[in-house]
Amino acid sequence: MGFASASREEKLKMLKTNKTRKTTKHLNRLAKRKKLSREIRDGMADIKSRKSADLRQRAVNIEDDFIADRQAHYENSDEDLPLDMMDADIDWENSAFANAKRRLEKKRSGVESDSDDEDDVEKKKRKFAGLLEEGHEELLPIKLKDGTLIRPTREKEVKEDEEEKSGDEEEEGEEDEPHREDFSHLSASELIAKRRELMQEFKDTIASHANMLLSNPQVNIVRLRDLYNLCNGEKIHSLVRESVQKLAIASTLQVLLDILPGYAIREQTAEEKAQKQKKETRNLVNYEESLLRYHLKYLQLCEKLSNKLVGKDRHNDESTFTFKMGILSVKALARIVVSAPHFNYSTNIVSSLVRLSLAKNETVIREVCEAIRTVFKEDIHLKITLFTARSISTLVTKRKGRVPPELLRTLLSMNITEVKDEDKKSGKDALIAKKYQIKKEKASKTAKKYKKQLARLEADLLEVEAEESMSKKLKNATEAMKFAFQSYFSILKRMPNSALLEPVLEGLSKFAHLLSIEFYEDIVSTMENMVQNENLKSLDQLHCINTVFVILSGDGQLLNIDPSKFYRLAYRVLNHLPFEKRPEQRKNQIIMAAKTLETMLVIRRKAVPLSRVAAFVKRLLSIATVLDDFPALCIVSLVRSLFIAHPKLSSMIEDEEGGAPGIYRPDIDDPDVANALASDVRDELSMLARRRNTELSRFANNILYGVPSTGIFKLNPQLSSLKPWILMGQLMDNAKDAYDKVESKYLDDLEKAAKKRNQSVTPKNINFHISNWLAASK
């Protein structure tokens, strides 16, 4: 179309274009001669930039579409979890990772297209002009009246022979797949060699995938999908499937632990997805989403395999493949939550582990509880501690207390020493208001005075902010302790068997100082009722007594409670210590007795009469004479601290007869009427000083000679400053022989002496026999 035949509007447009072109050429010539000002040059550059903006945006869109298409292809090529995950015995919809999986799928569905595989760009063949589609043939062309040529096509007819041939080829191809290859014709030696060959191939494959992931995880993240498929046993011959699955699960675990970032991956919001992102940012987001997806799939697989171990008499045979895969999955979940408690789905792993503690197999329970215990010990911010305590409390309530004792014992490892004081309020708001007031009055103040006041206020504000950050940890600690006490009270309410009482009472004894004051009277009343139960073990009785005195030593001292009954109970329990034959139980009893008596007689020394303390000293040293060396050392060290806290006890080691009138009654289980001040402890200390254990002999001589701090009977300050139970633990650890057997030599000698009188030694008369035995040994 020429200029003459064009319409008026088209002519104006053409004139405008020609004029613009001439003006542009003229300006370019002037620019080359450097005769244009900077403003005009900048204006020309801006016009060029705006004209080419569409082209640049089109190029960016093409690149973004290509990246999105590649990502969609990788995601569509991922295979969903196998249908056998929906086993009837696994409530998969209520599993720990079900909600996480649904959220991830919902997120993916928002950005993925719903196109079928046949519409995938990569799977489509390119179409060029003049080429026919596959499966079509061209017919004779048809020429129309206006000269246009039409080239009709039709589908090719496939011959039956060709169809059968192609079908046979497909079947042969399927049979040639490695995981379907038939080795039944091989001999035993050939089968072993073939298995070794296949295993080596899969080992090389796993090593290659792992190496690529570790060298550049962001580029090779798709290899994590290949490792997951091997964990699932896909395309692996049955000859080596079990071994390859175990190897793949262990290798994938280590790879995940090495590439997991040191932060939790946050899901992007809809606004963030709609925003334009840099290429590096988009690649990082795609990598994080892929890592999170495969990490979740791996956790779901481990949960599925480990859940097969839970139930009545379920797969307790440790030689089966199901059990081996289950225990391997339990260890994998445990290692992930211990090594990366900050990462996504850590709370889901904790929920799964807590539920796995209901397994009937001791190995599973031990692995689960050890992982939970480690999480408690290493948790700094107490966030995962709070969630774990809540999960345990929920399980205890749901199961009505029918949980393993080991699970409750894990609560003892919580790293909590204080809780938040609800009455203490932060003064941050008041300080901020004061800061604005000072700035408002700046004009009426001198510069020096203004800076001084502002600096002091800023320092106070920083201190308050530091306290608030610390209060978040205390808040988590407070909530965690609430759930722990809820578990304890739920079990005490139902009065279960003694196996559950021991960890509950031990927990109450350890955390009694963190109890809220409104529970004090109820706890003391409950402990009083329980400790009077004759079937309660000595260790549990000591836990009850210690709980009461921890309460009474703190805020509970304002309660109107007479503790004398608990002193009598503790005095009576001491007679049972020599009769415990199990080393671990004896050690725990001695430690608990030492802690309880220190609270009763040292911390509360101002509220305890001297006659009562003397009775405990006399009975403790009498019992120590028939104990083996390490427990005896713990008791003697405790008695030494009593002599320091109560100096008037020195009358019990003096040679002169200046004690209280009357006689000592060792057969009475009441320390207030035993009249121990009328006796002495020189015989007991002399016998203990003759022991072969060097430290025990030194401690006994130190007490016997008035607890001197100088001279030949002084003690090593590094040992004498330790708590009695810590001293015993250190010496046990440093001993050449492990404390795996209770030495009953001294108790046997006592029983032989009693047998000569045709009597037997019992907790009720042991002090009477010890007095006669010591008198005969002089």
From Swiss-Prot:
InterPro entries named in the record: CCAAT-binding_factor, Noc3_N, Nucleolar_cplx-assoc_3
Region (Disordered): 101-122, 151-186
Superkingdom: Eukaryota
Pfam families, sorted: CBF (PF03914), NOC3p (PF07540)
One term of GO molecular function: chromatin binding
Gene Ontology, cellular component aspect: nucleolus
Localization, UniProt: Nucleus, Nucleolus
Regions of compositional bias (Acidic residues) in chain numbering: 160-176
UniProt entry tagged with the keyword Iron-sulfur: no
Primary subcellular site in the record, as a coarse category: nucleus
Keyword terms: Coiled coil, Nucleus
Coiled coil: 433-473
Record-level GO BP terms: DNA replication initiation
Family: Belongs to the CBF/MAK21 family.
Name of the protein described by the UniProt record: Nucleolar complex protein 3 homolog
